């Protein structure tokens, strides 16, 4: 597929401090065939004025205007997805910064995929570097690249290895995902699971996004959720609910192996079961011994 038009979705809310830098990083991409669709979620600061300014400055930027009010982070992105018509859609946070070749690298990856892969739900994602509020790199990789390169392992049940602002999905994935299931709490995790069950996940082993950490960004501000994810709380309750809901909704579409994996996962994460029994069952998944031992402690 040559020179595909990309759609970038940005959900904004009170982002006046950093959003100009992110918009500029998108405008300065080496790959130029894109459009940026933004929906503001009721900002109380100067975010909307900044968006209006950029919309006038670049015809590829479109600000959605509706009367739906504040939907919250997740529903804001869902609303944006309903307005995405292009074959390939990327997600942008308002406070990150994209390296200028990010889109170029994604298009290069698309060009190397065969028709069969492109005809199914597809998720392509890269890595990011963790930065402070001045975009100085604190850590070169946000995602464990060794884990992310694992394509045929069932370890994804217990690992968060997809970050929304580094992700791109195709139209097949969007059709599969919306409206969001009731138990979706993180859209990136949702797309990750759907790609594993129904399509393909492709990892670009480069940090093409500067992921800015500060006191007000969506994940960074939610300390309890960040702790559960980054400290690898292996039985994150909401994740279990989502996987169970996917099983119930798509039972007839899931492959036999995936159904078996889900059943094992639900057994291992069933807190009503004996911990030693769950530890024994956990050998089915490719987890290190230390992680399996955490079953006995955190389960």
Question: What residues fall within each predicted segment?
Answer:
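C-terminal subregions of glycosyltransferases and related glycan-biosynthesis enzymes
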Residues: 157, 178, 184-185, 197, ...
């Amino acid at each position: 597929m040559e020179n595909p038009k990309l759609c970038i979705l940005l959900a904004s809310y009170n982002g006046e401090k950093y959003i100009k830098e992110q918009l500029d990083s998108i405008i300065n991409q080496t790959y130029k065939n894109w459009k940026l669709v933004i929906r503001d979620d009721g900002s109380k600061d100067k975010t909307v004025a900044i968006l209006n300014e950029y919309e006038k400055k670049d015809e590829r930027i479109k600000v959605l205007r509706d009367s739906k009010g504040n939907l919250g982070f997740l529903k804001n992105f869902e609303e944006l997805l309903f307005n995405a018509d292009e074959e390939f859609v990327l997600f942008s946070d308002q406070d990150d910064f994209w390296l200028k070749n990010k889109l170029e690298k994604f298009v290069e990856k698309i060009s190397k995929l065969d028709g069969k892969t492109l005809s199914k739900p597809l998720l392509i994602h890269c890595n990011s570097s963790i930065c402070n509020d001045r975009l100085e790199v604190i850590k070169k990789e946000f995602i464990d690249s060794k884990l992310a390169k694992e394509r045929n392992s069932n370890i994804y049940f217990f690992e968060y290895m997809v970050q929304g602002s580094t992700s791109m999905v195709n139209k097949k994935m969007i059709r599969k995902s919306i409206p969001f299931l009731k138990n979706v709490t993180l859209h990136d995790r949702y797309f990750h699971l759907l790609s594993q069950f129904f399509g393909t996940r492709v990892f670009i082993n480069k940090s093409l996004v500067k992921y800015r950490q500060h006191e007000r960004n969506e994940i960074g501000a939610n300390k309890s959720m960040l702790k559960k994810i980054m400290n690898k709380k292996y039985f994150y309750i909401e994740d279990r609910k989502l996987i169970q809901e996917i099983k119930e909704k798509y039972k007839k579409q899931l492959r036999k192996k995936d159904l078996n994996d889900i059943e094992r996962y639900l057994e291992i994460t069933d807190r009503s079961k004996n911990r030693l029994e769950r530890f024994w069952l956990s050998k089915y998944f490719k987890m290190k011994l230390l992680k399996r031992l955490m079953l006995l402690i955190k389960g």
